[in-house]
Amino acid sequence: MGNLDDNKFTWVIKNVPTLNSDMLFSNYFVIGGCSWRVVAHSKENNFKESLSLTLIVAEDSAQKMGCGWSRYAKIIFTLVNQISEILSQRIETMFDQKSSVFSSETMFSIGKFDEHFAGFIVNGEIKIVVEFLEIIDKLVLSKESNPPFKKTKLNNDGEVSKDLIREVPVIMESIVVNGFHVLPSQVEFVKRIFEKHPDVAKEFRPTNRIVKTAYMNVLLSLIETLRQSPREISKNDLDGACGLLRSMKEAGFKLDWLEKKLNEVLEKKEKEESYETRMREIEEEMKDLKAKALDVGAPLRLDDVV
């Protein structure tokens, strides 16, 4: 269930203590002329240790925007603490034709979630707010490229209203690759995965089209993340990747090859951080040595001689 208020989308996840899934999807909602969805993911499969929040561009909106589109968005994720304070994280990110889903992720590593520790789970509920500060269409930079925020209603039962259905048409085009519906821009990428790893989804059982597409998009996002250099990937990104990879494996994907790559990136990241720490230490040591050298080379005072 979710509710819209101008440029904000509020999502309440209920019955958290009894959830048996580590990945949840909000309803679709329309803001700035684009359809979006939020994904909540728990590393520990219980939504009590940590929480990753991901914003995705809906597949139908990606199709509607056509070839070569890109969209800049400035977002604030807020995890509402119902007892004391609010935990939020601001994100500025670019969505485009190649990375329209799972493109922007933020992880809240805040320890225990339940009301006895942090106040994020109260009466079995977590409250999440996504606020859009700015959306800019980078394909055509004009007065119309930044459409005004549009409020879209949900029915009392939490289902999408007819207004939203009219605003977001059905998926116009997708191509099936090994049983997965993907965007035309993703076809070659997905084909390459199945050519190199034919058993990657052999034990993946879900048959729902939306669920299958969401999992495939997670896989593509993980691969894109790990293609970056360790310097470009943050520690939070890698923590989130570890959690998502675990979920993918639990869902039936065979990803030993991707896990190996992730471990390599983690090792490189640790080495990079270690080298950077050592470089800072060396710089401090050099400053001390220079100061000592200047002190040694300084002329003696009269009192030092007489």
UniProtKB/Swiss-Prot annotation:
Entry keywords, A to Z: Coiled coil
Q: Which residues form the MATH domain?
A: 6-132
The cross-references to InterPro entries, in alphabetical order and at most eight, read: MATH-CC_domain_protein (IPR050804), MATH/TRAF_dom (IPR002083), PLipase-like (IPR007942), TRAF-like (IPR008974)
> What superkingdom does the record give?
Eukaryota
Metal-binding as a keyword of this entry, yes or no, is no
Pfam families associated with the record:
MATH_2, PEARLI-4
Q: Where is coiled-coil annotated?
A: 253-298
Alphabetical list of PROSITE patterns matching this protein: MATH
Please name the PANTHER family in this protein's record.
TRAF-LIKE SUPERFAMILY PROTEIN (PTHR46236:SF11)
**Designated name of the protein:** MATH domain and coiled-coil domain-containing protein At3g29580
The species this protein belongs to is Arabidopsis thaliana
